[in-house]
Amino acid sequence: MAKEELLEMRGKVVELLPNAMFRVELENGHEVLGHTAGKMRKNRIRVLVGDEVLCELTPYDLTKARITYRFMPGRGGPGQGPGPQ
């Protein structure tokens, strides 16, 4: 599957589940089951309940997602430069 086919959506972590899984509520109100991407695991980026995250979904299964970015309060997202100072 090519990367162009992935859907990126913003969401909020609402529940921590076993085996490094998370229940994420997307901007549109849908809830998906998410897991952290390998680079986030490798760099030990913690994801907690209430965190704003960026998820990648495949058009073939819209119930599962990969968490690729955790938004920091007061900072911009990926590719947005520094936040307010």
Curated annotation (Swiss-Prot):
PROSITE patterns: S1_IF1_TYPE (PS50832). One of its GO terms (molecular function) is translation initiation factor activity. Signal peptide: none annotated. Keywords: Cytoplasm, Initiation factor, Protein biosynthesis, RNA-binding, rRNA-binding. It comes from the Bacteria. Coiled coil: none annotated. It is found in: Cytoplasm. Residues 1-72 form the S1-like domain. GO terms for cellular component: cytosol. SUPFAM superfamilies: Nucleic acid-binding proteins. Component of the 30S ribosomal translation pre-initiation complex which assembles on the 30S ribosome in the order IF-2 and IF-3, IF-1 and N-formylmethionyl-tRNA(fMet); mRNA recruitment can occur at any time during PIC assembly. One of the essential components for the initiation of protein synthesis. Stabilizes the binding of IF-2 and IF-3 on the 30S subunit to which N-formylmethionyl-tRNA(fMet) subsequently binds. Helps modulate mRNA selection, yielding the 30S pre-initiation complex (PIC). Upon addition of the 50S ribosomal subunit IF-1, IF-2 and IF-3 are released leaving the mature 70S translation initiation complex. Belongs to the IF-1 family. NCBIfam families: infA. This is Translation initiation factor IF-1. It comes from Erythrobacter litoralis (strain HTCC2594). The gene is infA.
